[in-house]
């Protein structure tokens, strides 16, 4: 029997009156604000399938790889990205975040890091996906990108 792990990739960005509220609002925008998130490291099991994020049961405990950035400085460009690479064996995830960097550099760095992780493990990339969000801070802003483990 083959067990398939499902994961969803999501992101969100928002403002709030405080750093915590901005972060919470970004999680809500990403569809993961009403669950308890447990940060895990960066390995996906064999037979992982990437799916759309379903509506999650409020209060449930959900594992995720989470990238986030928060700033209170007006005009800051904040970025959060996750890069996912799968192979026929297993996969890797990296998170990357930044303030006032070119979003393409943040994205490229995430891709480079996940390619390296796969390479040192001797894994051939079958699929590579990047999810990112960028936000220009008005008062207090947050950006989040996540790989959410569903099973």
Swiss-Prot record:
GO molecular function list? arginine decarboxylase activity
Q: Where on the chain is Pyruvic acid (Ser) found, per UniProt?
A: 42
Q: Write down how the cofactor binds this protein.
A: Binds 1 pyruvoyl group covalently per subunit.
Q: Do the record's keywords include Lyase?
A: yes
Entry-linked SUPFAM superfamilies: Pyruvoyl-dependent histidine and arginine decarboxylases (SSF56271)
Q: Which UniProt keywords apply?
A: Decarboxylase, Lyase, Pyruvate
Look up keyword Phosphoprotein and say if it applies: no
Which cofactors does the annotated protein need, by name? pyruvate
> What GO terms in the biological process aspect are recorded for it?
arginine catabolic process
Q: Which reaction does it catalyse?
A: L-arginine + H(+) = agmatine + CO2
Q: Which domain of life is it from?
A: Archaea
Q: Where is this site: Cleavage (non-hydrolytic)?
A: 41-42
Q: What is its EC number?
A: 4.1.1.19
Q: Which PANTHER family match?
A: PYRUVOYL-DEPENDENT ARGININE DECARBOXYLASE
> Which NCBIfam families does the annotation name?
pyruvoyl-dependent arginine decarboxylase
Q: Which family does it belong to?
A: Belongs to the PdaD family.
What protein am I looking at?
A: Pyruvoyl-dependent arginine decarboxylase
User: What is the gene called?
Assistant: pdaD
């Amino acid at each position: 029997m083959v067990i398939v792990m499902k994961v969803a990739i999501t992101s969100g960005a928002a403002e709030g009156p405080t750093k915590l509220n901005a972060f919470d609002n970004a999680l809500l925008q990403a569809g993961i604000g009403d669950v308890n998130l447990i940060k895990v490291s960066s390995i996906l099991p064999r037979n992982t399938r990437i799916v759309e994020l379903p509506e999650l049961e409020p209060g449930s405990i959900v594992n995720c790889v989470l990238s986030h950035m928060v700033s209170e400085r007006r005009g800051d460009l904040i970025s959060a990205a996750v890069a996912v690479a799968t192979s026929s064996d297993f996969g890797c995830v990296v998170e990357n975040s930044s303030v006032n960097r070119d979003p393409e550099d943040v994205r490229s760095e995430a891709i480079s890091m996940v390619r390296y992780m796969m390479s040192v493990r001797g894994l051939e990339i079958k699929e590579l996906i990047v999810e990112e969000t960028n936000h220009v801070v008005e008062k207090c802003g947050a950006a989040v990108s996540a790989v959410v483990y569903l099973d």
